[in-house]
Swiss-Prot record:
PROSITE patterns documented for this protein: ATP_GRASP, DALA_DALA_LIGASE_1, DALA_DALA_LIGASE_2
Manner of cofactor binding, per the entry note: Binds 2 magnesium or manganese ions per subunit.
GO molecular function: ATP binding; D-alanine-D-alanine ligase activity; metal ion binding
Function statement: Cell wall formation.
GO terms under biological process: cell wall organization; peptidoglycan biosynthetic process; regulation of cell shape
The keyword Cell wall biogenesis/degradation appears for this protein: yes
InterPro entries, A to Z: ATP-grasp, ATP_grasp_subdomain_1, D-Ala_lig_Van_CS, D_ala_D_ala, Dala_Dala_lig_C, Dala_Dala_lig_N, PreATP-grasp_dom_sf
Designated name of the protein: D-alanine--D-alanine ligase
Primary location group: cytoplasm
One Pfam family hit: Dala_Dala_lig_C
Length: 367
């Protein structure tokens, strides 16, 4: 019997967050303990093809502003069989079609955005009977869609910001909605992340272009009223015995950093231009920190999440407001989720090991 746990790290994918998924995977591959885990790296191209890759972390990093990616030339074409009788087998699609290239005890789907973080790969893994890290189908789908995240949180009595959803048939905001939301507003793809396709609108004549940009990524657009306040984050982690813990808080500061005036934490600020400062732990009063940790655990439960999540807040004069919940947060070297857990006394390799062990303990199927 293989003493090490066989982990298939799946990354890349078809969404606009393909490159960030690759960067997250590189960080995870670098930090999974080789004495405990036998790791296989599986990349998904932007077109949706699966390839067995070498999984070298140095090839999965942002270098001189250039984003990494998976191509058809990155490795051997393969697929994961959905037959539960062949549980976890990664099968060749090449000349030796059907040959088992590797097998996995657990899959770590480091996929951000649609076609990965939204319940799609989770459904495939459930069909295949393969345990996987992170949330199940329902929580992944709900957490990916900002509209339904807010609906579930609000139904649980949790504080969320005012917003309007534009479906594909809706061209713009009504006059009544504009008056209610006020300016500025943030225009976002409803099912997206990493601030891709997001605009800050400070005048209504900017709205059509912002909607058009968001719709390049998702026909459904969410328009959110600006919430003045500090940006705080909290990590939630499930342990193999099923209990949950909330991490030390982190804070993102953009306004006033390196001459920034807009306070908008966009894609370039997050990943390319070092335009934000991250404080871990966040400088907040103990009672505020405890309240936000409690809200994070409630939000995790409200969407029926499993495994892990990062819950994002605005801290206003009237108290915390939940912005969103990320069921597969970033795992890059600068990402807040592993940093918050490190500040909580859980180092990166231990964090990853806990997530894998929790996935194995949970298994698949109805639970």
């Amino acid at each position: 019997m293989n003493a090490r746990i066989r982990v298939a790290v799946v990354y890349g994918g078809r969404s606009s967050e393909h490159a960030i998924s690759c960067v997250s995977a590189g960080s995870i591959l670098r930090n999974l303990d080789p004495d405990r885990f036998e790791v296989t790296a599986v990349g998904i191209t932007p077109e949706g093809s699966w390839v067995l890759t070498e999984g070298r972390p140095e090839t999965l990093a942002i270098t001189d502003g250039k984003l990494p990616g998976v191509t058809g030339d990155s490795g051997t074409a393969l697929t994961l069989t959905a037959d539960p009788a062949r549980r976890g087998q990664l099968v060749s699609l090449g000349e030796a079609a059907g040959e088992v290239l590797a097998s996995a005890d657990v899959v770590f789907p480091v996929l951000h955005g649609p076609y990965g973080e939204d319940g799609t790969i989770q459904g495939l893994l459930e069909l295949a009977g393969v345990p996987y890290v992170g949330a199940g189908v329902l929580a992944s789908a709900a957490g990916m869609d900002k509209e339904f995240t807010k609906k579930l949180l609000a139904s649980a009595g949790l504080p969320v910001g005012d917003h309007v959803v534009l479906r594909a048939r809706d061209s713009t905001l009504s006059l009544q909605d504009r008056e209610r939301l006020g300016l500025p507003v943030f225009v976002k793809p409803s099912r997206g992340g990493s601030s891709i396709g997001v605009s800050r609108v400070t005048a209504w004549d900017e709205l059509p272009a912002a909607i058009e940009l968001a719709r390049r990524h998702d026909p459904k657009v969410i328009i959110e009223a600006a919430v003045p306040g500090r940006e705080l984050e909290c990590g939630v982690l499930e342990f193999p015995d099923g209990h949950l813990e909330a991490s030390t808080l982190g804070e993102i500061r953009v306004e006033g950093v390196r001459g920034r005036e807009d306070g908008f934490y966009d894609f370039e600020t997050k990943y390319l231009d070092d335009g934000a400062e991250l404080d871990v732990p966040a400088k907040v009063d103990d009672d505020v920190a405890e309240a936000i940790r409690a809200l994070s655990l409630r939000a995790f439960t409200a969407i029926d999440c499993q495994g892990l999540a990062r819950v994002d807040f605005f801290l206003t004069d009237d108290g915390p407001v939940i912005n969103e919940i990320n069921t597969m947060p970033g795992f890059t070297t600068i990402s807040m989720y592993p940093r918050m857990w490190a500040a909580s006394g859980v180092d990166y390799p231990t964090l990853l090991a806990t997530m894998v062990e929790t996935a194995l303990a949970r298994g698949t199927g109805l639970r």
